Amino acid sequence: MPRQQPAAARPVRRRSYDQFCASARALDSVGDRWTLLIVRELLAGPRRYTDLHADLPGVSTDVLASRLKDMEQGGLAVRRRLPPPAAASVYELTERGHGLLPVLAALAEWGAPALTERRPTDAVRAHWFALPLLRALTGLTWEGVLEVRLDEGEFHVRTGSGAAVEPYGFGPAPRPDARITLDAELCLELGRGDVTLAEAVKDGRIEVAGDGPLAAELRGG
């Protein structure tokens, strides 16, 4: 009787590039698929697991749970229990996790030229346009909360120094200092630098609402 060959062992996944290099160390933490997109979601604030899964179409529950565990172990995120009556757990970024904002902003700027026609398989969420838009808002001097309305939905962003702490959030703002209405394509044009904020407002492609100093600055006042 022929001897049965042992089953080939599955290759062990490398958890580190084992290179004394800052870029390699960074990729050890965020180089896995989905990790940076989870960071993108958590930059908007604490999220429940179910909310993360809903806003990351295509990720399996096993992979999402694994990435979140890796992020906790790597010091990028923490899991905490909300007080009653919520009685739910949320994930939120640590200070080190928030430090990835410039990385995500640079990736959004680099990837914006690749967003031409939307593919039939492309999912979309309104707050995914926050990062390209933030690039165009960096010149604003007034600190405040700006509500953004697109056909795809609403989100809000912070202007001025507050943008470094909590750059954007989901849905309409409770008490926005100003409100703008535009389309998603213009968000991408602003992110690519094809048009400036002032030009878009002047040409009527951005509708500004509000009476405070932030709205006045957006109008060029």
Residue ranges: model-predicted function:
Residues 96-160, 164, 213-221:
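Acidic, aliphatic-rich amphipathic alpha-helical segments
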Residues 1-30:
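N-terminal leader segment of winged-helix/HTH proteins
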Residues 173-221:
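C-terminal interaction segments
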Residues 21-60:
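N-terminal helix-turn-helix DNA-binding core of bacterial DNA-binding proteins
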Residues 76-77:
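Short hydrophobic beta-strand motif reused across regulatory alpha/beta modules
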Residues 31, 83-106:
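Basic, amphipathic "hinge/linker" alpha-helix immediately C-terminal to the N-terminal HTH DNA-binding motif
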Residues 67:
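Residues within the DNA-recognition helix of helix-turn-helix
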